[in-house]
Amino acid sequence: NIGLRSAYVMSAFVAPHMVKQKSGLMVQVSSLGGYTYLFDVGYGVGKAGLDRLSADMATELNSHGVNSVTLYPGGGVTETTNFPGGETPTFTGRAVAALLSDTSEDELTQLNGKVILTMELALKHGFKDASGELPDGPFSSKENADGVRVSLNSSPFQYNGDGTIPNPNETNNLEIAKLFPGA
């Protein structure tokens, strides 16, 4: 219950310092649940809020040399999730490190306000997960990232006059619940 609020408070505190130094990068870690129905209303609203926070901060801080992006990891392996072949928090950390150390100012300006997939950054910058391999699970592979990018490049159902409401049973079922043993 504190994800979006904490992200906003942190951003509000650090933005003036970044504006003063005329540089900075804010990274919000969200998920595809910010774009399409995933798990439940609370999850989607929180993730959509993070996506909007990044986009709006990019708009307001752009003229001050401060960039803001949203990072979408694939399915993860953490203390509460266990997606087969999933990404570890190390992989997400390496994605942020690549943005900070291996991305030019021009590239950051181009990415400002956008959603970036961890797998896209791994393929571009050549980093791997803690295992020394790229994640290859059905929710974290290159093929999954390619499919997510296609979805992100189209309008969500609520903005598309011909769009259909998602079926919640696709993500709210026993098979998906098994991926969250610690929840």
Annotate each language-model stretch with its function.
Residues F13, H17-K20, D56-V66, T103-E107:
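Active-site-adjacent segment of SDR/Rossmann-fold oxidoreductases
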Residues V19, L25-S63, G75-V77, F83:
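Catalytic loop of short-chain dehydrogenase/reductase
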